Amino acid sequence: MAAILLTTRPKVPVSFEDVSVYFTKTEWKLLDLRQKVLYKRVMLENYSHLVSLGFSFSKPHLISQLERGEGPWVADIPRTWATAGLHIGDRTQSKTSTSTQKHSGRQLPGADPQGGKEGQAARSSVLQRGAQGLGQSSAAGPQGPKGAEKRYLCQQCGKAFSRSSNLIKHRIIHSGEKPYACPECGKLFRRSFALLEHQRIHSGEKPYACPECSKTFTRSSNLIKHQVIHSGERPFACGDCGKLFRRSFALLEHARVHSGERPYACPECGKAFSRSSNLIEHQRTHRGEKPYACGQCAKAFKGVSQLIHHQRSHSGERPFACRECGKAFRGRSGLSQHRRVHSGEKPYECSDCGKAFGRRANLFKHQAVHGARRPAKAETARRLAGPGSTGPGSAVAATSPPRPSTAARPSRPSRR
């Protein structure tokens, strides 16, 4: 495949045919998903570079096929593979090689209509050379190797680039132009590779497979994130408490614990949450929706995490064990509360007397001493009492009657 990245205008006239490779329908079927993705990406990049460098020609039929998501095949006729993997500077050599092969009477590799082992190996070689050419032209193109002088300056933001092609791509950010449209849903993209990644949503194609568990992904970035699970690596650390996370978004969610930020508010009652998933579960409270049902007892829950926690009551599973004493718990929250026994941490403090507790429930019980009530319980009591109930009856509904003290209880006569 012609893996050519045109970063400056060539000294000789160049057509799209000079930097493209065609497949027959038979040959296209022999390529695996990774090779097809590489081919599409390079062809679209070649076309966009030629256009950006000022070459005027009508859109090639091959590009129209790729943008529509069709296969790039042509009629089953022999054609030259010698151009694959070469740069613009090798154009003369490519034509000479082509002419020599044509007149020597030998069949070209890759022109095997039956798709034999020799032909398939040749095609793989072409794709491999294409991938290598892509890397070579990126690393040692006309603007020099990595670390070369950044001579191409963006006039709008002042950012500099070592390649003119990178500057051209960067300018699209300022213009807001999105020239690549999805033929199925019409969504627009700034880069051709972004369109190719998006089209996998429609096709269901997942070319990136995890070598350890075989799980597949539509994007290489998602595969890289997934592989962190197998490595056990947790590269994202919280600056406040040092807790480590596998994903950057998990660290962002955790940081809200320290900042107290709750950006997700319920439009019905105004209650706010630090996670969008918690808001979704909460909204089911208003609708009375409980979509997650236990298969053993038919009990239903608002969230899948609640269902999983409940199912452990049937299985007896307690996967969260304390490292200090070995005590195990069904849920992570139970383990977190238990750890405070060892650490002595008491994060729940009474606003009236300053006494602290390891559990929120114990704080609520203690606040009854001061006559305080939980806001949620008070609101429930007002609803039960009905509108306009402000007398002693509402107070009785809000709190249960106090238990008599031991000293006030009459002693029972002993039985003899």
From Swiss-Prot:
GO terms for biological process: regulation of transcription by RNA polymerase II. One of its GO terms (molecular function) is zinc ion binding. Residues 14-85 form the KRAB domain. A zinc finger (C2H2-type) spans 152-174, 180-202, 208-230, 236-258, 264-286, 292-314, 320-342, 348-370. InterPro entries: KRAB, KRAB_dom_sf, Znf_C2H2_sf, Znf_C2H2_type. Pfam families: KRAB, zf-C2H2. Keywords: DNA-binding, Metal-binding, Nucleus, Repeat, Transcription, Transcription regulation, Zinc, Zinc-finger. One of its GO terms (cellular component) is nucleus. It is found in: Nucleus. Belongs to the krueppel C2H2-type zinc-finger protein family. KRAB domain-containing zinc-finger protein that represses B1/Alu SINE transposable elements and modulates the transcription of nearby genes in a tissue-specific manner. It regulates glucose homeostasis and lipid metabolism by modulating the expression of the endocrine cell-defining transcription factor, MAFB, in pancreatic islets and, the fat metabolism regulator, ACACB, in adipose tissue and muscle. PANTHER family: ZINC FINGER PROTEIN, ZINC FINGER PROTEIN 487-RELATED. This is Zinc finger protein 92 homolog.
